Amino acid sequence: MIHPLLQQPSYRIIDQSSLGTMFQAEQSFATDDTLCASTQERGAVLRAWVHTDTIVLGIQDARLPHLKEGIRYLHEQGFRPVVRNSGGLAVVLDDDVLNLSLILPEKDGIQIDSGYEAMTSLIQHMFQDVTNDIVPGEVVGSYCPGSFDLSIDGKKFAGISQRRVRGGVAVQIYLSVRQSGSARAEIIRDFYDLAIQGEETKFTYPTIVPETMASLEDLLGIPLTVQDVLTRAYRVLSTVSLLQNATLTADEQTMFASQLERMWKRNEPLRDIEQQLTEE
């Protein structure tokens, strides 16, 4: 049975999965904070987003002892780093990674586990015609490990995080749809190697074993695109709610501008490092 939290009266559908390189991760995180703040009034949202060749870093990643060397490596691999405004650690985003944000009004105080369970339920129902083997639980050796990693046969293809802002909850998931999950993990492994260089750190960063990660296409043995996965999400939610295509309202656009300013500020130290690298 589908998780009761998913049974909202309606969902605004905001599809930002094909905006290309002009749409940057800072804009995504600012959008989710904006939608969290308006969801009490405007109702639930499903937002889809894709970012080309981006490494999203957690707050702890920004404190790595040799961060500059890590950033240099990411640039050499063609990736743009961004520090997110929620918990978690480094993840890889590219054109074959679909991100979904469930933005839910927190009317009765949504328990943290309930948010994770709702997203897990959505993904399980999206693929129930193909597999019943999608399970939550930390996959040791994966990047950004957490108790609500999603895996099939021990190989992780998705990770879930949450962000709470002013009466709303954003439950965010990345889904590795196609291409090599282990190749993505190698990038994060090498980033940590260069950014830590064997030094002792207060925070314990994961030891990445690339073979613990895979893509949905590889795990399910069926051809998949980002659009295929998105269609499956719409199909599931349409059985329990009314779906309406939407964009940000005028009020939300105003709020978005101030949230985006916060994200730019949060990322100023990274941009400073990038400036130093270009001057070397």
Swiss-Prot record:
Catalytic activity line of the entry: N(6)-octanoyl-L-lysyl-[glycine-cleavage complex H protein] + L-lysyl-[lipoyl-carrier protein] = N(6)-octanoyl-L-lysyl-[lipoyl-carrier protein] + L-lysyl-[glycine-cleavage complex H protein]
Top enzyme class: transferase
PROSITE patterns: BPL_LPL_CATALYTIC
Active-site feature positions: C144
Alphabetical UniProt keywords: Acyltransferase, Transferase
Location of the BPL/LPL catalytic domain: 40-245
Lowers pKa of active site Cys (site feature) positions: K156
Annotated metabolic or biological route of this protein: Protein modification; protein lipoylation via endogenous pathway; protein N(6)-(lipoyl)lysine from octanoyl-[acyl-carrier-protein]
Chain segments annotated as coiled-coil in the UniProt record: none
Record carries keyword Transferase: yes
Gene3D superfamilies for the chain: Bira Bifunctional Protein, Domain 2
GO terms of molecular function: lipoyl(octanoyl) transferase activity
E.C. number: 2.3.1.204
GO BP term, pick one: protein modification process
InterPro entries, per database record: aa-tRNA-synth_II/BPL/LPL, BPL_LPL_catalytic, LipL, Octanoyltrans_LipM/LipL
Superkingdom per UniProt: Bacteria
Entry similarity comment: Belongs to the octanoyltransferase LipL family.
Function: Catalyzes the amidotransfer (transamidation) of the octanoyl moiety from octanoyl-GcvH to the lipoyl domain of the E2 subunit of lipoate-dependent enzymes.
PANTHER family: OCTANOYL-[GCVH]:PROTEIN N-OCTANOYLTRANSFERASE, OCTANOYLTRANSFERASE LIPM-RELATED
Further comment: The reaction proceeds via a thioester-linked acyl-enzyme intermediate.
Protein name in the entry: Octanoyl-[GcvH]:protein N-octanoyltransferase
Source organism (scientific name): Exiguobacterium sp. (strain ATCC BAA-1283 / AT1b)
Gene: lipL
